[in-house]
């Protein structure tokens, strides 16, 4: 009974969104409280403008910071290449 009530509520919330196809594309399943939701371009610009410094990035995501420093190097050893590939596989596995 609880499951059906919760699922009906979530479905109603999902349908109450003004632009349902935008919500599906952006993975925004719950409606916003604003009348004019921010579109994907505005969100990506905000994210790009608030990019982290290398120090903050290395503190938050050490494997990404390592990849960035390795990519900036002029010559990479085979071990460095394999490390970059492993990190990209890790990102792909856990980001999606």
Swiss-Prot record:
Residues 1-25 form the signal peptide. It comes from the Eukaryota. GO terms for cellular component: extracellular region. Expressed by the venom gland. It is found in: Secreted. Residues 45-84 are annotated as: Disordered. Keywords: Secreted, Signal. Belongs to the non-disulfide-bridged peptide (NDBP) superfamily. This is Venom protein 3.1.
């Amino acid at each position: 009974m609880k499951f059906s009530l919760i699922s009906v509520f979530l479905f109603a919330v999902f349908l109450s969104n003004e632009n349902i196809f935008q919500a599906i594309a952006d993975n925004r399943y719950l409606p916003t409280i604003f009348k004019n939701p921010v579109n994907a371009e505005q969100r990506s610009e905000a994210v790009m403008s608030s990019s982290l410094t290398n120090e903050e990035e290395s503190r938050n995501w050490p494997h990404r910071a390592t990849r960035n420093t390795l990519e900036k190097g002029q010559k990479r050893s085979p071990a460095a290449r394999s490390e970059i590939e492993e990190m990209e596989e890790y990102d792909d596995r856990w980001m999606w």
